[in-house]
């Protein structure tokens, strides 16, 4: 088995919670486009903010969030949505893990070959959208 599942939804909707529920029932491994972003800016964040972008608290993440959004957006725009995909693609495909490969942050369908298209058309993956219930 080598099924790839992408989870989409706004920040705080429960994408990682869905991963935790799935991984408790079947062999699953987590992947994230945002982890690639955090790896890329980690040295800068530690030097300028004293924050490890890969292992920060929720409060620290809110401090660096504008930088993450800005940098991530610039890279997406310059590559028509492919920059973070290309960063994660090799790791995902080369990983010999035999179970569900779950990408916990499929967010964009802005460009023709963006994250949703990549998941569905290139990886033959399944997309799950999580909505946060509010009263």
Question: Where are the predicted features?
Answer:
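Extreme N-terminal starter segment of soluble prokaryotic enzymes
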Residues: 1-5
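Sparse, context-dependent recognition of short Cys/His-centered cofactor- or disulfide-binding micro-motifs
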Residues: 7, 26, 53
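P-loop (Walker A) phosphate-binding loop of NTP-binding proteins
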Residues: 10
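Conserved lysine of the Walker
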Residues: 15
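Post-Walker A alpha-helix
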Residues: 18-19
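ATP-dependent NMP and nucleoside kinases share a basic, alpha-helical "lid"
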Residues: 25, 29, 87-135
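ATP-dependent small-molecule kinase phosphotransfer cores
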Residues: 33-101
């Amino acid at each position: 088995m080598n099924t790839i599942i992408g989870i989409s939804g706004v920040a705080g909707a429960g994408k990682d919670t869905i991963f935790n529920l799935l991984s408790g029932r079947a062999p699953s491994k987590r992947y994230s486009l945002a982890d690639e972003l955090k790896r890329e800016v980690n040295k800068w964040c530690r030097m300028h903010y004293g924050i490890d972008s890969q292992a920060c608290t929720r409060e620290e993440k809110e401090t660096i969030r504008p930088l993450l959004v800005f940098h991530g957006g610039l890279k997406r725009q310059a590559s028509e949505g492919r920059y973070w995909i290309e960063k994660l693609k090799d790791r995902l495909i080369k990983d010999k893990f035999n179970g569900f490969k779950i990408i916990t942050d499929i967010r964009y369908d802005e460009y023709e070959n963006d994250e949703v298209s990549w998941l569905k058309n290139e990886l033959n993956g399944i997309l799950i959208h999580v909505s946060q219930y509010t009263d």
